[in-house]
Amino acid sequence: MIQPESQFFLFGMGDREKYIYKNKSLIRYKDNLCIYSWDGYDEEFIFDEYTVILSKKGEGRVVLCENETGFFVNDQCLSESKINLPTFEGFKYQKQLKILHHEILVNIIDGKPVPNYFVYNKPWYRDGAMMGMVLKITNNLHLIKDWILSLTELYDYNNQMAEPDNLGQLLYLISLVSNKDNPLVEKVINEAKRISIDGKLTGITDGSDHTIYSTQWMIFALKALGIENDYFKIPNKFDDYARMFWMDRQGVERETFFDNKYNWLYPYLWWAVKHFENEPIDESLLQITYPMTWEKQASQAKYENIRQLSNIYADNQFSAPHTWHGAEMFLYLIEMEK
């Protein structure tokens, strides 16, 4: 985890205006305009309450706080809209879940779920689908419903090619807010069959052949839509991405050589495999901090754009918070409670 120049906090969950708090200033994201500055004030961060408190002797205090109604500076509401913020009362990892939920919600911009809104300007179907699983649990699907229903492309083309796992991810997204009668469903299934051999999706995902992973997504999404499947089948071959698909382990052999070494570049991959294997998590990876999630050296991220938040982040090709990482952590911690 790379530390920025100074502690920051992002305000503007869901479809609210985005604001950056850092260096005792509140900056509006869209035009980089400093709205408030509190030089000489002491600051206190309460990450799991989405709150920053500034105080100065003789001047009283200023409270920046975001809740289910809006984002407030004391009694002034800077952005208002309804979102659901569960307290996760009674959960072992209550504070972590609240922070992770925030890191997902804050990366919904203009109704679109993106991995990190500084370095990615459009959604990825995979990250969006994982975010959708979280939003379903927290009753916040209304935040991305319009985006899902507006989709027309079968692939997101974010890696400059048509990646087969996108098809199942798109179908799953549709299942969250619509049903099998959605006009895109038939097109997706026909495309999946077109690129399949013996019921197994073919093609390149993340630069490699991940046939099992892509087919897993398709079967999972059809089940979510209530569509009977007698065509797509899990292939009998090795695919290291298969162990990331914890949503349905059927037909996938557990691997005996799982590398426990943490993936500091793409931690969501490590978390997904941990979830699949039902492995315990080292408590050092669950410390209360902010942000809790990140990605480093991703090929399609525009890291220069995150200088607005941190020069150190930009120089190190680092973005935080990150929604796929956040979703994998959140969903495993939720399952661990069961």
What are these regions (language model features)?
Residues 1-123:
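Low-complexity, Ser/Thr/Pro/Gly-enriched N-terminal "stalk/linker" regions
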Residues 1-3, 13, 27, 53-55, ...:
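Generic low-polarity alpha-helical segments
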Residues 5-7, 15, 235-338:
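Non-catalytic carbohydrate-binding regions of carbohydrate-active enzymes
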Residues 18, 54, 62-65, 183-186, ...:
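Polar/charged alpha-helical tracts
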Residues 87, 122-234:
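Aromatic-rich carbohydrate-recognition surfaces in CAZymes
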Residues 120-142, 170-178, 221-222, 244-255, ...:
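Alpha-helical support elements that line or immediately flank enzyme active sites
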